[in-house]
């Protein structure tokens, strides 16, 4: 007369554990993708800033070196256009010798710096980056030839994890012939 029907609807413990496992895997994968995207964005932003800083420094040095004058008095570069003190230190007479006098670019403590007669030493690149290599090479500074300066610079970001690194080289000759 009475039929007992099983009207208990629900999940078994195994079904619940399987669904929690699948949900955890999906959330873990989504979190991993999000964290990877943030790391990639941070790396890209650092790389863009590195390009900006390096480009500014190279343009600044190129303009100053291109506009340099021959040191006819011999006070700055011993009568030459450029004087390489060591491979990471260049000295020359500024285009406006009255205002700036002798100008220098050099590497000091992993920072690219500039100095002239009338100003203190100033950094050209943000302290968030370190210059791992700076080399100046002068060719053709003998009498009768137009001098050229080749600059090689390697800059790297400072921070935890993988940081971008940039190597750049350029060659500059003086704008005004003074041979």
Question: Where does each model-flagged region fall?
Answer:
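Short linear sequence signals and composition-biased patches located at protein termini or domain-edge surfaces
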Residues: 121, 128-179
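Aliphatic-rich helix starts adjacent to a transmembrane/signal segment
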Residues: 2-4, 8-62, 66
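Generic beta-structure capping elements
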Residues: 36, 115-117, 154
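Short regulatory "switch" loops immediately downstream of catalytic or recognition motifs
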Residues: 69-73, 157
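Type IV pilin-like appendage domain
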Residues: 72-143
């Amino acid at each position: 007369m009475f039929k007992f029907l099983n009207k208990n609807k629900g999940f078994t413990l195994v079904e619940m554990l399987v669904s929690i496992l699948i949900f955890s895997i999906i959330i873990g994968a989504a979190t991993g993708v999000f964290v990877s995207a943030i790391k990639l964005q941070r790396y890209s932003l650092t790389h863009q800033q590195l390009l900006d800083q390096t480009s500014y420094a190279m343009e600044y040095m190129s303009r100053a070196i291109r506009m340099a004058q021959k040191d006819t008095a011999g006070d700055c570069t011993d009568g030459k256009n450029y004087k390489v003190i060591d491979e990471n230190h260049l000295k020359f007479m500024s285009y406006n010798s009255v205002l700036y006098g002798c100008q220098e670019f050099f590497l000091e403590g992993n920072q690219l710096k500039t100095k002239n007669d009338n100003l203190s030493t100033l950094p050209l690149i943000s302290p968030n980056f370190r210059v791992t290599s700076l080399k100046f090479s002068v060719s053709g500074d003998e009498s009768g030839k137009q001098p050229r300066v080749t600059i090689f610079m390697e800059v790297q970001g400072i921070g935890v994890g993988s940081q971008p690194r940039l190597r750049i080289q350029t060659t500059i000759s003086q704008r005004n012939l003074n041979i």
